[in-house]
C-alpha cells in the first residue's frame, strides 16, 4: 500500500512539473526567437513596401530616431538622411527590381542577402545616367533596437557596380558566377 502511494505521489509530481511550462531560461529563448521572427517580418515588409514606391515607410514607426546607415563616405544618421540615401535608387534607376533573396538573424541582428536590378537612367550618387542595366547582389548587416531598424551596413562588389554603370558595350561581369551583357 505504501509503495502504491509513493508511486501515485511520484506520478502526480511528474505530471504537475511537466505541465508547469518552460523554465525561465527556456521562456527567454522562446521570447527572443519570437521577437526575432517579428523583427524579420517587419524588416522584410518595410523594404518590400519601399521598393514598391512607398518611401513614406521610412519613418519613426519602423526606424529609430537615430538610425545609422554606414557608408564609405561616413555614417548617415536619422530617418530623413536614411530616406534620402535610399531615394538615390529611385532617382538613378528605372525598371528597378529589389529582391530580398534571404534574410535571417540572431538576437537583435539580421543579415539580408539581396539583389537589385534596374536601368541606369538618372544620376546615381553623382554618376550620370548611362542607360546601362545593373544587376547587383549584396548583403546588409542590420541591427534592431526595440523592434525598430537602428543600423544598416551594405556590402557589395563596388567594382562590379562601377563596371556595369560605366561600361560602354560588350560583356560585363555581374559577379564571379554570372556574366551579363550590355
Please give the residue ranges for each predicted region.
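Bacterial N-terminal signal peptides that target proteins for export
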Residues: 1-9
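Bacterial N-terminal signal peptides
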Residues: 8-17
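A solvent-exposed, acidic/Ser-Thr-rich amphipathic alpha-helical stretch
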Residues: 56-107
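Exposed beta-sheet edge and beta->alpha loop/turn motif
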Residues: 117-146
Amino acid at each position: 500500500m505504501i509503495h502504491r502511494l509513493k508511486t501515485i505521489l511520484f506520478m502526480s509530481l511528474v505530471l504537475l512539473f511537466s505541465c508547469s511550462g518552460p523554465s525561465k531560461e527556456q521562456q527567454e529563448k522562446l521570447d527572443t526567437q519570437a521577437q526575432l521572427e517579428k523583427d524579420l517580418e517587419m524588416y522584410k515588409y518595410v523594404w518590400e513596401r519601399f521598393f514598391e514606391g512607398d518611401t513614406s515607410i521610412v519613418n519613426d514607426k519602423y526606424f529609430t530616431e537615430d538610425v545609422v546607415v554606414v557608408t564609405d563616405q561616413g555614417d548617415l544618421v536619422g530617418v530623413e538622411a536614411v530616406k534620402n540615401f535610399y531615394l538615390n535608387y529611385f532617382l538613378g534607376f528605372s525598371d528597378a527590381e529589389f529582391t530580398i533573396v534571404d534574410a535571417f538573424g540572431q538576437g537583435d541582428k539580421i543579415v539580408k542577402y539581396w539583389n537589385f536590378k534596374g536601368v541606369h537612367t538618372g544620376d546615381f550618387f553623382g554618376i550620370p545616367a548611362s542607360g546601362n542595366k545593373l544587376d547587383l547582389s549584396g548583403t546588409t548587416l542590420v541591427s534592431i533596437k526595440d523592434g525598430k531598424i537602428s543600423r544598416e551596413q551594405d556590402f557589395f562588389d563596388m567594382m562590379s557596380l562601377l563596371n556595369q554603370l560605366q561600361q560602354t558595350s560588350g560583356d560585363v561581369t555581374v559577379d564571379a558566377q554570372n556574366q551579363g551583357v550590355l
